[in-house]
Amino acid sequence: MQREIIKAIPLLNEQGNLTQAGYAKKLLPVYDRTKVKGGAARLKEWDYYYVGNDRFGVAMTIADNSYMGLDSVSFLSFEGEPWQITKSPMRPFPMGRTGLPATSAAGVTASSGKHHALLFQVGEGKRVLTAHMENFRDAQPIDVRITLDREPEESMVICTPFDRQIGRAHV
């Protein structure tokens, strides 16, 4: 059953469960990481952007899924014979230390490794997305700098409950 969230609500209740499953077209569910039960091992946070047109697209992700961090850059070409390439270096056990902002409406998200760096800056009415990754395609690096200065009228906010059966692969 699909249910649209149309007013600001807390994302999680005091027990750490979703207050309402569904979707919103704006950032209406309010996230409070202190309500995630089970400590740092239960945090699953990421910041993802896709920017594209009819010719190409770029996707960038910084993720902290407790046991595994992921910094990803994808380039998609839609001209001629379509192709895509994705490089996703992983970081072991970041356990929340990536320091993602509590909201996607403002703040800085950053992560780097020996051969890459990603930085997402949100504030002053714009989003600046930068990425550098060595050996991206044919031993050449990729450098990305995208400035978004108009917020879309709608975005996608999805609130999906996960099965909490103890002793199962998905808790």
Where are these regions (language model features)?
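Targeting-peptide/extracellular-domain and disordered-appendage signature
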Residues: 1-168
